[in-house]
Amino acid sequence: MDPRGILKAFPKRKKIHADASSKVLAKIPRKEEGEEAEEWLSSLRAHVVRTGIGRARAELFEKQIVQHGGQLCPVQGPGVTHIVVDEGMDYERALRLLRLPRLPPGAQLVKSAWLSLCLQERRLVDVAGFSIFIPSKYLDQSQPSKAEQDASLPPGTHEALLQTALPPPPSPTRPVSPPQKTKEAPNTQAQPISDDEASDGEETQVSAADLEALISGHYPASLEGDCDPSPAPVVLDKWVCAQPSSQKATNHNLHITEKLEVLAKAYSVQGDKWRALGYAKAINALKSFHKPVTSYQEACSIPGIGKRMAEKIIEILESGHLRKLDHISESVPVLELFSNIWGAGTKTAQMWYQQGFRSLEDIRSQASLTTQQAIGLKHYNDFLERMPREEATEIEQTVQKAAQAFNSGLLCVACGSYRRGKATCGDVDVLITHPDGRSHRGIFSRLLDSLRQQGFLTDDLVSQEENGQQQKYLGVCRLPGPGWRHRRLDIIVVPYSEFACALLYFTGSAHFNRSMRALAKTKGMSLSEHALSTAVVRNTHGCKMGPGRVLPTPTEKDVFRLLGLPYREPAERDW
């Protein structure tokens, strides 16, 4: 992940969490001068738990509650009606954070999405679908019945609560890693790293804006600006895609980041993506800092590092160790072992762990595997070992020779880390097209049959994946002769009109690509592996309402030029 982009991505300023809930807050009409505020929350006596929600967003919630007639109460204050918590909170953690043995009488534990919907609808909506179930033993003995609660509500509130319940708005997601090739099993949580769930403080409060910054290398504009159809001027020096990867900063804090990366990995394999992202943010901020960190105050001054994380940094500086590493669950190395099986992600690894499996032999002999997972397990060690560049060259030439046996004009290019000039590669992606725009048709199946007959392709993971006019094969290959390992190979056949954008996409790096796509979006454009389009209309949520107009891009240089970027050679895109 890009250290330089992260530093640019997190300016030292207060920021609003740009998820569905915070967008709702941004859309609340501002009160005009002289206009009396509507008090449609007059029956609400709320307490907002900031953990997970974040200070800035919680303050916005509290301001809106008061502005619209509601009251803010201490959690044990008389008459508190709603305790608002983060979406991912369960009742056990909520009570632990509140330091209460049971819920106060008359109070309901609700997700923050409920309050967001109330603000969006400008009314008190039903909590159905938003309330968090609490076993009766955690309810105060004096907790009134539902009928008693209804009877105590002010006039008009009962009717408001009886209105049809709306489903909670979907939580926005932005992938940190590529999607799994196979369907994941239901999520079952493994043992957490430690019982001290509140110990991470600020670094766990990662906003969707932070996520956007991580993947684009640019801190998003304010939420109010998201609705402006006119693209804002772009400062290119803040974008990863505008800079050569050779400008990556020297890591002056390696002794710190190494230990934090262990924790980040532990959270990641346990499926705690937001906490893992919080650590990634801090790690990259440290990597890009211009000097070794020497004090707590200096650590706090770095954008992307909060007080809790600064405490961990100082602990490492003073003792050379981080005590939290001593409490990493024994499940972590097992989960990492399992998640390295091709076709098995975090959720599947957690499911296997919960079923009692502890080794690859357990998986091999007892687990129910998909076809892809069985292949991934069979070639586990081969897939994990990166291949030397010379082997990737041999694989590219084998595919090229087989393809050009059908048509000598076919272009075959190995992409990915190979094209970026890396000394080793994890897999090989070969892109195939023909300059006449026609002769690539029909080559896909014939090429695969030929490579199978040669014994070059040994296993099929995904025989054919249609993506518009592009066809993609995911499989396993092995070069002829003794001593060669099984390697992951993807073959993608594309029309020539899409070749430049596909070449850019499959060359990567993934971080560089995400930065380019985010930049295109700010310009009212859209970039994908198929095309670069302009005049793209999006709604207020950023979703495309139409395809726009496709721009001609004969070469990669045209894509850079149309985006107003200096051209970067593949070796300069290795962010």
UniProtKB/Swiss-Prot annotation:
Compositionally biased spans, kind Acidic residues: 194-203
Active site per database record: K312 (schiff-base intermediate with dna)
Region listing for Involved in primer binding, in residue ranges: 420-429
Region (DNA-binding): 265-279, 345-348, 466-505
Highest rank taxon of the organism: Eukaryota
GO cellular component, one term: site of double-strand break
Protein name stated in the entry: DNA polymerase lambda
Naturally occurring in which organism (per UniProt): Macaca fascicularis (Crab-eating macaque)
InterPro entries, A to Z: BRCT_dom (IPR001357), BRCT_dom_sf (IPR036420), DNA-dir_DNA_pol_X (IPR002054), DNA_pol-X_BS (IPR019843), DNA_pol_b-like_N (IPR010996), DNA_pol_B_palm_palm (IPR028207), DNA_pol_lambd_fingers_domain (IPR018944), DNA_pol_lamdba_lyase_dom_sf (IPR027421)
One GO MF term attached to the UniProt entry: DNA-directed DNA polymerase activity
UniProt EC number: 2.7.7.7, 4.2.99.-
BRCT domain segment(s): 36-132
Co-factor requirement: Mn(2+)
Binding residues annotated for dCTP, in chain numbering: R386, S417, Y418, R419, R420, G426, D427, V428, D429, N513
